[in-house]
Amino acid sequence: MSQAGSSPLYAAIDLGSNSFHMLVVRHIDGSVQTMAKIKRKVRLAAGLDEHNSLSMEAMQRGWDCLSLFAERLQDIPTQNIRIVGTATLRTATNVDVFLEKANQILGQPIEVISGEEEAATIYKGVAHTSGGSGRRLVVDIGGASTELIIGEGFEAKALTSLKMGCVTWLENFFKDRQLNARNFEAAIEGAKQTIKPILEQYTDLGWDVCVGASGTVQALQEIMLAQGMDEVITHSKLKRLQKQAMLADHLEELDIEGLTLERALVFPSGLSILIAIFELLEIDAMTLAGGALREGLVYEMVDELRQNDIRARTICSVQSRYQLDCQYGEQVATLAGKLLEQAGGDEWIAEPQGKVLLETTAKLHEIGLTIDFKKGGEHSAYLLQNLDLPGYTRAQKFFIGEIARRYREQLSSLPEQHAISGTSAKRVLRLLRLAVLLTHRRNPSLEPQVELLAEGDKLTLSIDAKWLEANPLTAAELEIESNRQTDIGWPLTITAC
């Protein structure tokens, strides 16, 4: 790795109870670009005996993993590296033995952080990478601990680290490897008893949204998407997956569509903990966070990345990296927002996220032109669906890409997506296409006076007659657009006024 002065590298290493993770990023254009992610299943927690002494075999697995990580740290400045140990290293009575050799291997100090500090860092990672407003409940199920955090913006209001995790619950409740109702019920009840001491505090504080920041939640989302469900986790979906798991008599026979072999061993135990959290805290829905502990460590090192609006930071970073016309993007977004208000605002596009995604796509829709004009929409879709966009979920990235794919010329119906309702989705697309057509001169002072009337899906766009006479090319393109939308069942009438 070369160390460019203008784009410094940072590394964050998390010595977890189930896996060791390493994240290497580059700080560029006001954001972070992931350069490497390395994960090794070490299952450190499984090496603890009844006296909380870590076995030599478990320590050796950890040292072997760190030998691999050490190679990637050689070219990164010491001040840009954070290495932390979590629940198992907090618990192990012989942790000094492990740390002495681990420090030698890495050539860097390892911090064994408290449960509260771990929870605070997880929250920072979530706050810096996940969009949305209001108070959020963050759930992170690790190998030997589970962190529950309530916060708003970048401020955590309640931090708790509970002594339960997918590895320890595996050993405590699924030791016989049987996936029967008795084991699941015991695991769920055990988790509830662990959570109960903090229940009143958390329910009194309350929250608006819930996000999951762990491998368990990521595995659940991958399973749901593989099975044709949307990405939002609900209690009914968790119970459905429990039933699927119980179709296998033993853990070694577990075969659920979308579940990787790597995650299978600790899946039932992690699922049990999450079911208990949903039931006890009465959670309606959960989405996957954009980051957690490792991302929190990175953002602690890079002070200038602290910005309240994560999505605004992401948009600004992408515009800078791809040299987009920011003023024009703002012009399209402003007009699209104006058209939305004329059409009925949140009565016409019900979901608040609809307006956010319309604005985002308006500001980034031309990104594909940096590759080629001819297939600009196709390139925009590919980039927006595959770039790391902190603040946006996988479903939202897919939706933004599909809207950008269709921002001009030929029009086709949208594919199935799970970001917003189908009705709102097509309305976002219609508004963006009109805003792009009406701003083609790229100067707000040259825009026409317009009025958009919506009666359900029937749109009537009234435009100043003199402007239409003075801009015959745009007038012709608007007539073509009227035909395109009407032909696929989205009636659009253009009138002069």
Curated annotation (Swiss-Prot):
EC number: 3.6.1.40
Keyword field: Hydrolase
CDD domains linked: ASKHA_NBD_EcGppA-like
Protein name, per record: Guanosine-5'-triphosphate,3'-diphosphate pyrophosphatase
Pathways per UniProt: Purine metabolism; ppGpp biosynthesis; ppGpp from GTP: step 2/2
GO terms of molecular function: guanosine-5'-triphosphate,3'-diphosphate diphosphatase activity
GO biological process: guanosine pentaphosphate catabolic process; guanosine tetraphosphate biosynthetic process; nucleobase-containing small molecule interconversion
Catalyses which reaction(s): guanosine 3'-diphosphate 5'-triphosphate + H2O = guanosine 3',5'-bis(diphosphate) + phosphate + H(+)
Gene name of the encoded protein: gppA
InterPro entries for the chain: ATPase_NBD, GppA/Ppx_hydrolase, Guo-5TP_3DP_PyrP, Ppx_GppA_C, Ppx_GppA_N, PyroPPase_GppA_Ppx
Protein role: Catalyzes the conversion of pppGpp to ppGpp. Guanosine pentaphosphate (pppGpp) is a cytoplasmic signaling molecule which together with ppGpp controls the 'stringent response', an adaptive process that allows bacteria to respond to amino acid starvation, resulting in the coordinated regulation of numerous cellular activities.
